[in-house]
UniProtKB/Swiss-Prot annotation:
It comes from the Bacteria. Keywords: Cytoplasm, DNA-binding. One of its GO terms (cellular component) is bacterial nucleoid. Homodimer. It comes from Ureaplasma urealyticum serovar 10 (strain ATCC 33699 / Western). The keyword DNA-binding applies. This is Nucleoid-associated protein UUR10_0100. The keyword Cytoplasm applies. Binds to DNA and alters its conformation. May be involved in regulation of gene expression, nucleoid organization and DNA protection.
Length: 99
């Protein structure tokens, strides 16, 4: 087993993962929650913007709006994390025995 070659391959894989992670963290994803809320979220999970359709804003029922916003943000975070995992997993070669 050539440990030097293995170390070089691991370093290359680490650099590739690091580059993809950095690119992903800066990427902005758009999520439309049931047509009511549009969320722009970066890969690092920073919310860039939240747009709410006026028809769901009822001053006498703020609880419903809060529930919709919470669900929309949670879904955006969940989908962004799944996207990140898919990208990272596609970068790691299968059968390496490391992951």
């Amino acid at each position: 087993m050539d440990f030097q070659k293995l170390a070089q391959e691991l370093k290359k894989m680490q650099n590739t993962l690091s580059k993809k992670q950095k690119e992903f963290e800066e990427k902005v994803f758009d999520f439309d929650y049931k047509g009511y809320v549009l969320i722009k979220i970066k890969g690092n999970l920073t919310i860039e913007s939240i747009e709410v359709k006026t028809e769901i804003v009822d001053p006498e029922d703020k609880e419903t709006l809060q529930d919709i916003l919470r669900a929309a943000v949670n879904e955006a975070i969940s989908k962004t994390c799944k996207e990140r995992d898919a990208i990272m997993n596609s970068t790691i070669p299968k059968g390496t025995g490391f992951f």
